[in-house]
Regions:
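Structural/interface elements that position substrates and couple domains in central-metabolism enzymes
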Residues: 1-176
């Protein structure tokens, strides 16, 4: 997705092309802001650590971990590139959980993105269909405003960042 941005390629066409190879498939080939959760990040770190303990470097696994962390910054950088100075800007965050259909925020990219936005002086309005109580608990010390609907979060915002691909967030009705 990052290369597609730089060369002007349609990431959806590239995704479909790569995914058409039966050896790869397209189930998990979606661009995004990084993975999270309680299992995959921990397992990747453990695998890399075990290899290092035995004198081996798993370069691909270590690159996966490094790129995942970088992806969280890509969202922030895109917002900064689009909006310039973020001080006083309002950014709506759609999706707080690490994946749809859960309230689990462990290792969720949203926490990193929100933290960076707030550090840059932006106002953050957040919406998630089920993870807002968990987000309030985890980020209780941060001045995040929680909206009752996705549209309330977006109203008057300078930008909207979709961080969790809930079905209801994918195709907004902007005439709402």
């Amino acid at each position: 997705a990052n290369l597609c941005d730089r060369v002007g390629a349609d990431v959806e066409m590239v995704r479909k092309g790569i995914g058409s190879d039966a050896r790869i498939g397209n189930k998990f080939l979606y661009p995004g802001c990084g993975y999270g959760g309680s299992c995959f990040p921990k397992d990747v770190k453990a695998l890399a650590h075990t290899a290092r303990e035995h004198g081996y470097t798993m370069q691909v696994i270590e690159a996966v971990e490094r790129v995942n962390e970088q992806q969280k910054g890509v969202v922030f950088e895109k917002l900064r590139a689009a909006l310039g100075d973020l001080r006083g800007k309002v950014v709506a965050i759609w999706g707080l959980a690490f994946k749809p259909e859960t309230d689990d925020m462990r290792e969720a990219p949203a926490e990193v993105v929100i933290g960076r936005l707030l550090d840059a002086g932006a106002e953050v309005r957040a919406y998630d269909p089920v993870a807002m109580p968990e987000s309030r608990r985890r980020m209780a010390d941060l001045p995040v405003r929680y909206a009752q609907t996705m549209y309330e979060a977006a109203e008057g915002a300078d930008a909207v960042a979709l961080l969790t691909e809930w079905k209801e967030l994918r195709m907004p009705d902007w005439t709402h």
